């Protein structure tokens, strides 16, 4: 077999590989250019103060939606960490349970566990959780100042430094 023939047999492989690389690059560019997903509109009651909480009231600054449930004991360490990172008025605690829950009791249980005051809204929001397809707990959604979802994370998360980095990226978005 001469060299010319051998080189031609690799050509389809090279073309396929180059095509794959270009396809992946195209997907990356499309994803990077995609419009951010807006956090849905909501108007719900803070179970601690009975005041209305809306998405519009959170606009203008970045914020975090923390989804959990009263029975989720493995969620406690995540709330502990995120509470230390996120400024006082920038974190909303949403309850995903369908059945009505005692938000005051939940807040008190969390304060006892954390051994500090939690001055955050505790909001019964199973419909919002369903709309956002929140199935795992805890679930965090980082929302930019314009109301767009910048990132999300499901499951136990206690690395406050990593949370602070994601928070800073959200604030800068």
Enumerate the language-model features and the residues they cover.
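N-terminal targeting signals for export/organelle localization
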Residues: 1-45, 173
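Cofactor-binding loop segments of dinucleotide-utilizing enzymes, especially the Rossmann-like FAD-
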Residues: 67-69, 94-96, 145
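The canonical Cys-X-X-Cys-His
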Residues: 72-76, 140
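Loop/turn elements at helix/coil->beta-strand transitions in domains of secreted/extracellular proteins
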Residues: 59-63, 87-92, 118-120, 137, ...
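Thiol/disulfide oxidoreductase modules built on the thioredoxin-like
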Residues: 116-118, 124-168
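A short beta-strand-turn-helix
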Residues: 41-63
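Structural microenvironment flanking redox-active thiols in thiol-disulfide oxidoreductases
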Residues: 76-114, 124-131
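Short pre-active-site segment immediately N-terminal to redox-active cysteine/selenocysteine motifs
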Residues: 61-63, 68-71
């Amino acid at each position: 077999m001469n060299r010319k023939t051998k080189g031609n047999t690799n050509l389809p492989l090279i073309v396929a590989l180059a095509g794959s690389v270009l396809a992946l690059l195209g997907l990356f560019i499309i994803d990077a250019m995609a419009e951010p997903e807006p956090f849905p509109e909501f108007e719900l009651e803070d179970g601690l103060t009975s005041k209305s909480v809306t998405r519009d009231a959170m606009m203008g600054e970045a914020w975090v939606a923390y989804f959990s449930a009263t029975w989720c004991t493995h969620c406690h360490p995540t709330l502990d960490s995120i509470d230390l990172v996120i400024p006082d008025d920038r974190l909303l605690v949403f309850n995903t349970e369908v059945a009505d829950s005692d938000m005051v009791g939940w807040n008190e249980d969390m304060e006892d566990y954390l051994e500090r005051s939690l001055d955050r809204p505790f909001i019964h929001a199973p419909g919002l959780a369903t709309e956002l397809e929140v199935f795992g707990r805890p679930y965090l959604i980082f929302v930019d100042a314009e109301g767009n979802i910048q990132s999300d994370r499901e499951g136990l998360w206690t690395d406050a430094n990593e949370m602070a980095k994601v928070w800073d990226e959200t604030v800068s978005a």
